[in-house]
A protein has these predicted regions:
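Flexible "cap/lid" loop of the alpha/beta hydrolase fold
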Residues: 104, 108-109, 114-145
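Active-site loop/oxyanion-hole signature of alpha/beta-hydrolase fold enzymes
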Residues: 52-91, 257-268
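Catalytic active-site module of serine/aspartate enzymes centered on a nucleophile-bearing elbow/loop
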Residues: 239-284
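Conserved alpha/beta-hydrolase "acid-adjacent" motif
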Residues: 222-228
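Gly/Ala-rich beta-loop-alpha elbow adjacent to hydrolase catalytic centers
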Residues: 95-99, 103
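Hydrophobic, aromatic-rich cap/lid helix
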Residues: 171-203
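Conserved HGGG/HGGXW glycine-rich cap/lid loop of the alpha/beta-hydrolase fold
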Residues: 8-62
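Short beta-strand/loop motif that positions the catalytic acidic residue
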Residues: 210, 216-218
Length: 284
């Protein structure tokens, strides 16, 4: 477990494996990377190096609010800089949900640095966008407007970041509330713009322009719908899609929330599918 200063932010990271091509995997939401340790070890065991990191404002990394781009673009550029420092380019990029968004934006913004994509539980659709825009941004904008940065520090998510890295408390308290609200508002606007896009964060043209091979495992809940996965798979020029990794439900009977236990139990399947895909594309 190590740290690097990436664009003035301390980023907590870990490399699993000692040799072979580099793969970066990222979890969903703003969760820490620990949940991907077992999957990463399975993939690394057949000759890969897996880079895991806590994104800014996640896990044990430092908080930092950059309104120069959407949150997912900021994360994608942070990962590129981290991989550059570790001499880990080109990368196979992957992840679930928000981590899959990061991977796709990495491929869009850094095509020469991208060797392939391993994606699962892609997010898309109006319901998902509205629900997540409130969860990721709206609730924090309202808190900051009503009760300032003290209330942000006491919120469940940011409290967990302070527990993981106590210096985040001072950094949050010294962030001007106007700057925090401005950044969160801009990130929310970027997110809401995705309501008509095939997936959150990328247009049809952007997806179609990605030339790296992609392996995509469809979700089975209302936020990560099979329809979203199918749309993305059609638009990506070189993509294989798997719809039978977790329980398959009709499109009008999807789970209301993703089943963490089911995905945890499916990890050996994911590892098998992903490593077979990499070998098929001579990434070995």
């Amino acid at each position: 477990v190590s740290e690097a200063i990436i664009r003035n932010i301390a980023i907590h990271y870990e490399v699993i494996g000692h040799e072979g091509p580099w793969i970066a995997l990222t979890p969903g939401s703003r969760r820490p990377y620990n949940e991907l340790l077992n999957l990463s070890k399975e993939i690394a065991s057949v000759g890969y190096r897996v880079l895991l990191h806590d994104r800014r404002n996640c896990g044990s990394s430092e908080v930092g609010f950059d309104a120069s781009a959407s949150e997912h673009e900021v994360w994608a550029d942070d990962l590129h800089e981290l991989a550059l420092q570790l001499n880990a380019l080109p990368l196979v990029v992957g992840g679930s949900s928000a981590g899959a968004r990061l991977a796709i934006l990495f491929a869009i913004r850094h095509p020469k640095a991208t060797q392939g994509m391993l994606l699962w539980r892609l997010t898309g659709g109006l319901d998902a966008v509205n629900h997540l825009a409130q969860e990721y941004y709206g609730q924090f904008i309202a808190l900051a407007q009503n009760a300032g940065m003290d209330a942000i520090c006491q919120s469940e998510h940011f409290r967990s970041l302070i527990e993981a890295r106590p210096s985040n408390l001072n950094k949050l308290k010294s962030t001007p509330v106007e700057e925090f609200i401005r950044t969160m508002t801009y990130w929310r606007e970027c997110f809401l713009e995705s309501s008509t896009l095939p997936i959150v964060g990328a247009s049809e043209e952007q997806l179609h322009a990605i030339s790296s091979p992609a392996c995509l495992i469809a979700g089975n809940d209302v936020i990560h719908t099979p329809v979203t996965a199918r749309k993305a798979a059609k638009l990506l020029t070189n993509c294989e899609i798997h719809e039978n990794v977790v329980t398959h439900y009709p499109d009008d009977q999807l789970l209301k929330e993703w089943d963490r236990q089911e995905w945890k139990q499916a990890e050996p399947k994911l590892a098998k599918i992903f490593t077979a895909f990499l070998k098929n594309h001579s990434i070995q």
